[in-house]
Amino acid sequence: MYKEIFRWVIAIISQPAKAWVLLAKKGEKQEECLSRFVYPLIGFVTVAAFLGVLFTRKEFDLELALKASIRTLVSSFGGFYLGAYLMNEIWQGIFKREKDLKLWLRFVGYSSSLMFALNIVLMLLPEFFFLRIFILYTFYIVWEGAGPYMGVEEKIRLKFVGFTTAIILLTPAVIEILLSMLMPGLSF
């Protein structure tokens, strides 16, 4: 299972056009996508946050590691679900399409794979903070998935990709900021 997750993450990042076509043909169920791809990736990010705090700080602080992993878990899960929900609403409101939350959960999950992979690397190796710029590559991943996976026409593709990328990238960040503001004990 973990090899398959790793292969899909690499495929989506390195060859998004080909990966989206394969994912569209695969036609997997929502539960399968979530339990075999998204949830394990969020688990990896959470474990990376825990280990990153334990091994990259000068002091060995278990409490701080638990706080970091809780904040990461809540912001990743919340960002994923809130992003899918918001895009489902925008899908109907702005793009005049029929709501399909299951489709959006899969699309946001696969589109977030670069963000999850970067979070894992940056939590374990914080010295490579400059890699954060590659998060903008999510725009291209969403662009390639808009046609084959979501069936978006060329004339509205740019607007679709702009909305989707902004929501995928901003919802976890907003939730993390809100958590830090509402619960100052989670800030460090």
Where are these regions (language model features)?
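Hydrophobic alpha-helical transmembrane segments and adjacent short intramembrane/lumenal linkers
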Residues: 88, 92-173
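Selected alpha-helical membrane-embedding segments in polytopic membrane proteins
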Residues: 2-99
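Short, intrinsically disordered/low-complexity patches at protein termini
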Residues: 45, 54-55, 138-139, 181-183
